[in-house]
Regions:
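Glycine-rich, charged/polar anion/phosphate-binding loops
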Residues: 80-82, 302-305, 332, 361-363
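Anionic group-transfer/hydrolysis microenvironments
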Residues: 99, 139-141, 321, 379-381, ...
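Single conserved hydrophobic/aromatic residue that forms the stacking wall/gate
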Residues: 1-12, 397-402
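Active-site-facing alpha/beta catalytic cores
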Residues: 92, 102-103, 107-352
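Long, contiguous, compositionally biased segments that the model treats as domain-scale units
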Residues: 14, 22-170
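Catalytic-face loop-and-helix region of soluble metabolic enzyme cores
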Residues: 336-396
Length: 402
């Protein structure tokens, strides 16, 4: 079952102790508050793409503070998403994930959040009608403040500074102070993620996501002459809506939608500090988001990022590139979903249209032969970009995965 992940392709990046996979983590900069509730032992594993914080005591204070704060999401919500991801793995639902390549503190405004949410809801309405299938709506939002970098440092005019690793780590300005990793930024990221989730809940529970309202947005979209070709499709949805209303469908029941958050579990200290025990079941949940994924650079089956996620009950994803071997995929299933529970593991392909037909089939066959269920998600943005205004990467929707 192929589902869809959309994110913009802005060239925003992140840093770590060193680029690439497999470099052991510098334990001297990690905090010592490693409670026994975390059985996974990720600190003893190689951990790439981590910031080098200059003050270990300050890092320890920040993570202790984070551990004392309320969860951003709740176990019941996570379980609901897991059930919907299980339906998608069986072909009974379609997953739509959208949001920024990397969020910024500057754009953490009500208007930016509303517009991203609106776009995802509009797309979900069209997909639901076109496929006659429920759509699982996930925002790459409320926590996507970090992203891996290919180089640990950046040099300009003979000056070398740490790379910009996202707003939860350092600042984009090219000065020594701005580029020095600051653990207090994780607290800022936590607070901004909380306000984003609060606003999303208000929108999706308060009538803003009403199906009739979402359809009216799509009608406005087709008023643009550039999109006239979609007008007939909008008319079909319009007729279906009128039929539902005439047939007595309770539209009040369609005023609310389930909307979930996701981000890359990149900053190990932050994710570890956000793990909580569910009082109902005793299970561990990473309460920074409903769904977490590990990236192409950090997905080593025995490495720290995968090890951390083995210990939590959230649905998790793994980015899969064109150079991934079938044995790599099976090893990841062994680590992240050894008992084969539907809804637990998603494989997110990031291959580009040019390499997809060659690289993906062997991986699909390996998963099929293994027999344990996964939810397939395709990222049509990666590898299909063009350079738009101001050197920003963008993607034409008609050039995505075939």
């Amino acid at each position: 079952i192929y589902t869809l992940s959309l994110h913009d392709a802005l060239p925003i990046s992140i840093v770590g102790a060193g680029p690439g996979r497999g470099r052991p983590y510098d334990a001297s900069v990690m905090n010592e508050l490693d409670p026994p509730r975390i059985p996974a032992g990720w600190r003893a594993r190689p951990a790439s793409q981590q910031p080098v914080y200059p003050d270990a005591a300050e890092l320890a204070a920040v993570t202790a503070d984070l551990r004392s704060r309320p969860p951003l999401v709740f176990a019941g919500e996570v379980d609901s998403l897991r059930a919907q991801m299980a339906a998608a793995s069986r072909g009974r639902a379609f997953v739509l994930m959208g949001g920024d390549c990397a969020e910024t503190f500057r754009e953490n405004t009500a208007n930016h959040i509303r517009l991203k949410l609106q776009t995802i809801l509009q797309m979900a309405a069209v997909l639901t009608y076109g496929a006659s299938t429920p759509v699982v709506k996930i925002g790459r939002m409320a926590g996507q403040y970090a992203k891996p970098r290919s180089r640990a440092d950046e040099t300009r005019d003979g000056v070398t500074l740490p790379s910009y690793r996202g707003d939860s780590v350092n600042d984009h300005a090219f000065t020594p102070r701005a580029r020095t990793p600051d653990p207090r930024r994780m607290l800022d990221a936590y607070l901004r993620a909380g306000t984003t989730l609060n606003l999303i809940r208000s929108f999706t529970m308060g009538g803003y996501a009403d199906l009739r309202e979402v359809h009216s947005w799509n009608r406005g979209f087709t008023a643009n002459p550039a999109y006239k070709r979609f007008e007939a499709f909008a008319e079909e949805i319009d007729r279906a809506m009128r039929f539902m209303e005439a047939a007595g469908v309770d539209f009040d029941a369609l005023r609310q939608v389930d909307f979930y958050s996701a981000h890359e579990a990149l900053l190990l200290e932050y994710e570890d500090a956000m793990i909580r025990v569910d009082s109902r079941s005793g299970r561990l949940y990473d309460t920074s988001a409903h769904l977490l994924w590990v990236g192409e650079r950090t997905r080593g089956p025995q490495d720290a990022h995968v090890t951390l996620l083995t210990g939590v009950h959230n649905p998790v994803g793994v980015k899969i590139g064109p150079d991934t071997a079938p044995d790599d995929v099976v090893a990841l299933i062994d680590r992240l979903n050894p008992t084969g529970e539907a809804g637990r593991l998603s494989l997110i392909t990031r291959m580009g249209a040019d390499r997809l037909r060659e690289a993906l089939p062997p991986l699909v066959e390996a998963v099929r032969a293994d027999g344990r269920p996964v939810t397939w998600i395709t990222d049509p943005m990666h590898g299909n970009t063009i350079t738009a205004d101001k050197d920003r990467k963008s993607t034409r929707l008609n050039s995505s995965h075939p």
